[in-house]
Amino acid sequence: MGPLMVLFCLLFLYPGLADSAPSCPQNVNISGGTFTLSHGWAPGSLLTYSCPQGLYPSPASRLCKSSGQWQTPRATRSLSKAVCKPVRCPAPVSFENGIYTPRLGSYPVGGNVSFECEDGFILRGSPVRQCRPNGMWDGETAVCDNGAGHCPNPGISLGAVRTGFRFGHGDKVRYRCSSNLVLTGSSERECQGNGVWSGTEPICRQPYSYDFPEDVAPALGTSFSHMLGATNPTQKTKESLGRKIQIQRSGHLNLYLLLDCSQSVSENDFLIFKESASLMVDRIFSFEINVSVAIITFASEPKVLMSVLNDNSRDMTDVISSLENANYKDHENGTGTNTYAALNSVYLMMNNQMRLLGMETMAWQEIRHAIILLTDGKSNMGGSPKTAVDHIREILNINQKRNDYLDIYAIGVGKLDVDWRELNELGSKKDGERHAFILQDTKALHQVFEHMLDVSKLTDTICGVGNMSANASDQERTPWHVTIKPKSQETCRGALISDQWVLTAAHCFRDGNDHSLWRVNVGDPKSQWGKEFLIEKAVISPGFDVFAKKNQGILEFYGDDIALLKLAQKVKMSTHARPICLPCTMEANLALRRPQGSTCRDHENELLNKQSVPAHFVALNGSKLNINLKMGVEWTSCAEVVSQEKTMFPSLTDVREVVTDQFLCSGTQEDESPCKGESGGAVFLERRFRFFQVGLVSWGLYNPCLGSADKNSRKRAPRSKVPPPRDFHINLFRMQPWLRQHLGDVLNFLPL
């Protein structure tokens, strides 16, 4: 009998031999918690435990070995039963020049610790701190200081021990953590000549602690907000916007995104890594900065999907495409986590770029570099990643004077096998900043990248930025929106188009020319962020005359229904007050990421390029409502409805006598209709996370707020209404000569 026949017989008699590959036991439940598997019960699969908030799993994870047995956690000698344990926060080891209460060995979630200073010392930081469910204290380190040193007393974070008690220029202090706590931040700090301590404040953390998205997003967002606000090339900065990931207007940013694709990362988690990176790319490209993006995935070996040396690394579409094409199975034969090799790929890119540009050239020396490392675990092959970081710092000549030219953000995800010490070693350490984080899961990572931009930090008049985070107010979402009124009654809306000019409708002013009685409310009128401005000058289009065609039987005509208001003072930019982008300007061109040499016609073709264009306006209550602007043949059918309006136009024979090409048209059944009082407000679109005003609300055939004093009450027109609702908005592309005449010194207009 031949060998193949023997094999066939064995498989026939013992079918279990065909699928006898080992798998790990399934008796791995955790008391009070749940678990997930990265690759089922097969060897190489990572089992990750989760517990309700305020508890942590012990052990955090287990690995299915090739033998079909679960790997014993490092901290235990035997395979112990997984349990959920209560989270505790570290206690103070010492508190200088004061007392704290209560004095416990550690503190439960929700527990407080209070601090008081001795006479002659002033308390800096938080007098009361509470233990949070993630094992971290809220607030700031409490310090009792008498101001006697060249640098302020650096304090002692909870759970830490400090050596060094002199705070003069050149003096150093050193920190270590007690018991099993892990130190993040700088273990040594030096008092510098400017009175500031070097490095980052050290924090002692429980090994199982993690960061909340709401803590990480501001830390990252502040960095990018400063960078974005500092790189608007159409504005001149009068003050420093801070350090952070900042590049000068003449400089360039290289952004390196490193995505862990090792075996411990599930396919779904890798997808969220990609989505988070795409969010970052989308948002950073939506601002007018000079940026090149590198994309590197890594497991046992790195794979460069996009290099900063490629011209298409400056093109958002190409970068996003590279991310979308990243395949989870690209690294299926490599199970390790070689963070060193990933960072070394960045170093090699830098080295090649330096050779191309020349080490001594300004073109090379003015490039700033930001590395964002997304990983779920500890480096376990290839050598220490710190070595690669040292090489990167060396090639960039990072010293005290050039510290701003490199930022490394190390973000661990999943708590499972993330090594706090390694992340802290890799992350940059700069005064007042954090660069190392651990998030509970990939969903938290996605939240961070979704909400990381804090637009209140953008102090330039960068246009078209709305805060789209879940907790933003209506005014923060549309910060250009303003209310125009006499001393009491609100009458119209408008839009900030610069820090001193408002665009609105001319018919708002037809009842009188004494603009000294009028006011413009900018920001949220219901909060401290609202401010009332006087009008220095009103510019009404001379072509506007609502009764211009009365002799033709057209009782109201709204051609040239456009006006500009110059405010008596400039508006301070904030998350509640910011101009919208006006098409056909250099500011809008940068926001659209269009090439130099683009024209006004190019903007119109990009923004109004469909038969039905989704757009928005702002309601009386501040909410954003949806409409569809009809273009081409659909514009004609939209406008034709006016012929059915016999009250305003009893003898109309030609619709174009009323609806000229100055107007955009909306109002089909799925659209909202503007109310009386919403006239003059912006009609706007969103492109690449920026907002562009293409029209302003002028007039319509239906008032959904008629008979109601409630700003939140709107009534849709019945389907049987004749004529059906139609709304008309001044098309800003048709008002270019007038806008250029009056705003030529305010905005930078493109050729028509």
From Swiss-Prot:
<feature type="site" description="Cleavage; by C1S, MASP2 and GZMK">
    <location>
        <begin position="243"/>
        <end position="244"/>
    </location>
</feature>
<feature type="disulfide bond">
    <location>
        <begin position="463"/>
        <end position="581"/>
    </location>
</feature>
<feature type="domain" description="VWFA">
    <location>
        <begin position="254"/>
        <end position="452"/>
    </location>
</feature>
<comment type="similarity">
    <text>Belongs to the peptidase S1 family.</text>
</comment>
<dbReference type="InterPro" id="IPR018114">
    <property type="entry name" value="TRYPSIN_HIS"/>
</dbReference>
<feature type="domain" description="Peptidase S1">
    <location>
        <begin position="464"/>
        <end position="744"/>
    </location>
</feature>
<comment type="function">
    <text>Precursor of the catalytic component of the C3 and C5 convertase complexes, which are part of the complement pathway, a cascade of proteins that leads to phagocytosis and breakdown of pathogens and signaling that strengthens the adaptive immune system. Component C2 is part of the classical, lectin and GZMK complement systems.</text>
</comment>
<keyword id="KW-0964">Secreted</keyword>
<dbReference type="Pfam" id="PF00089">
    <property type="entry name" value="Trypsin"/>
</dbReference>
<keyword id="KW-0399">Innate immunity</keyword>
<dbReference type="GO" id="GO:0004252">
    <property type="term" value="F:serine-type endopeptidase activity"/>
</dbReference>
<feature type="disulfide bond">
    <location>
        <begin position="675"/>
        <end position="705"/>
    </location>
</feature>
<feature type="disulfide bond">
    <location>
        <begin position="24"/>
        <end position="64"/>
    </location>
</feature>
<feature type="active site" description="Charge relay system">
    <location>
        <position position="561"/>
    </location>
</feature>
<feature type="disulfide bond">
    <location>
        <begin position="51"/>
        <end position="84"/>
    </location>
</feature>
<keyword id="KW-0479">Metal-binding</keyword>
<keyword id="KW-0180">Complement pathway</keyword>
<dbReference type="InterPro" id="IPR033116">
    <property type="entry name" value="TRYPSIN_SER"/>
</dbReference>
<dbReference type="InterPro" id="IPR035976">
    <property type="entry name" value="Sushi/SCR/CCP_sf"/>
</dbReference>
<keyword id="KW-0378">Hydrolase</keyword>
<feature type="signal peptide">
    <location>
        <begin position="1"/>
        <end position="20"/>
    </location>
</feature>
<dbReference type="GO" id="GO:0006958">
    <property type="term" value="P:complement activation, classical pathway"/>
</dbReference>
<keyword id="KW-0325">Glycoprotein</keyword>
<dbReference type="GO" id="GO:0045087">
    <property type="term" value="P:innate immune response"/>
</dbReference>
<feature type="active site" description="Charge relay system">
    <location>
        <position position="679"/>
    </location>
</feature>
<feature type="disulfide bond">
    <location>
        <begin position="151"/>
        <end position="191"/>
    </location>
</feature>
<feature type="glycosylation site" description="N-linked (GlcNAc...) asparagine">
    <location>
        <position position="112"/>
    </location>
</feature>
<protein>
    <recommendedName>
        <fullName>Complement C2</fullName>
        <ecNumber>3.4.21.43</ecNumber>
    </recommendedName>
</protein>
<dbReference type="InterPro" id="IPR000436">
    <property type="entry name" value="Sushi_SCR_CCP_dom"/>
</dbReference>
<feature type="glycosylation site" description="N-linked (GlcNAc...) asparagine">
    <location>
        <position position="333"/>
    </location>
</feature>
<feature type="domain" description="Sushi 1">
    <location>
        <begin position="22"/>
        <end position="86"/>
    </location>
</feature>
<keyword id="KW-0391">Immunity</keyword>
<dbReference type="InterPro" id="IPR009003">
    <property type="entry name" value="Peptidase_S1_PA"/>
</dbReference>
<dbReference type="InterPro" id="IPR043504">
    <property type="entry name" value="Peptidase_S1_PA_chymotrypsin"/>
</dbReference>
<feature type="disulfide bond">
    <location>
        <begin position="89"/>
        <end position="131"/>
    </location>
</feature>
<feature type="disulfide bond">
    <location>
        <begin position="177"/>
        <end position="204"/>
    </location>
</feature>
<feature type="glycosylation site" description="N-linked (GlcNAc...) asparagine">
    <location>
        <position position="471"/>
    </location>
</feature>
<dbReference type="InterPro" id="IPR001314">
    <property type="entry name" value="Peptidase_S1A"/>
</dbReference>
<feature type="active site" description="Charge relay system">
    <location>
        <position position="507"/>
    </location>
</feature>
<dbReference type="InterPro" id="IPR002035">
    <property type="entry name" value="VWF_A"/>
</dbReference>
<feature type="binding site">
    <location>
        <position position="264"/>
    </location>
    <ligand>
        <name>Mg(2+)</name>
    </ligand>
</feature>
<keyword id="KW-0677">Repeat</keyword>
